[in-house]
Amino acid sequence: MTRQRFLALGLTAAALLGLVALARALPGWWAAPAAAAFAFAALLLSFLAPVVLEPLFNRYSPLHDAVLAAELRDLAEQAGVPVRDVLVQDASRRTRKANAYVSGLARTRRVVVSDTLLEQASPAEVRLVVAHELGHRREQHVLRGTVLAMCGVVAATLVVWAVLGTRVADPHRVPLVLLLGLGLSLVSLPALTFISRRWERRADRSSLELTGDRAAYESAFRRLARTNLSDLDPPQLLYLLLFTHPTPPERLAAMEAFSLQTREAR
C-alpha cells in the first residue's frame, strides 16, 4: 500500500470516527457541528498540503538552471502570483509522466517542476507548462476549488443527516455512510469534471497570454499527450464522466481560436 493510500484511509477513518462520536454526543443536532468540522478540515488541508503533506511523498531540490529559474520567477511576477522558490520534484522515481504545478499560499508559494518535464521538454515548453499552472492561480482556481470542496462536504453531511439521522451513532451504519458518500461522488462527477475542464481551458488561455508562444504551446501539449499517454478521442460518455482535462486536439483547436481572436482584435 502506498503512503498516499494509507494517508487517505487514515483521514477517512478519522472522519468516520468523528462522525459517529458526534452523533453519539449530540444525537439531536450532530449535523451542524459535523458539517462545520468537515468544512474546516477541507480548508485546513488546502493550506497544509503544500508544506506538510507534499514533502512526505516527494523529494524537492532547487532548480539549478539559474536562467530558467529566473525566467519562471519573472513569469510568476507577470502573472501576479510571485513565488518564493522554484523547485524540482523527483517524479522519475515513480513515473515517466511530466508535470509542473504551483503550490502553497502567500509566503509559501513555489513553482514545482518535475524532473521528468525538465528531461523531456525544451525550456520554452517548460515555461509554457508553468504559465498554464500560474494561470490557475491567476484565475483563483485553487481558492474556488477549496470553496467547492467545503460546500461538497457540507452537502454530503446534510444528505447523510436526512437519510440516517440519529442512526449514524450506530457503528454498524458506517458502511451505509460510505455507500452514500460513494453515491454522492458519482452523482456529482459530471458537474465536477465539467468545471475542471472549463478551468483547464481558462488556464490554457492564460498560458498563451503570458508567453505569447504558440509554437511552445503546440509542441508542449503534443509532447505531454505522448508522454502521459493521453486518449485523443475518448467515447463521449467517458469524456463527460471522467475527463478532467480537454483532449489534446481540443486544446490545439482552442489555441487556433485564441490566435484568430487576437489577430482580429488588432
Give residue spans per PLM region.
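Generic long, charged, amphipathic alpha-helical segments
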Residues: 169-188
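Polar-ligand-bearing catalytic/cofactor-coordination segments
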Residues: 1-169, 190-266
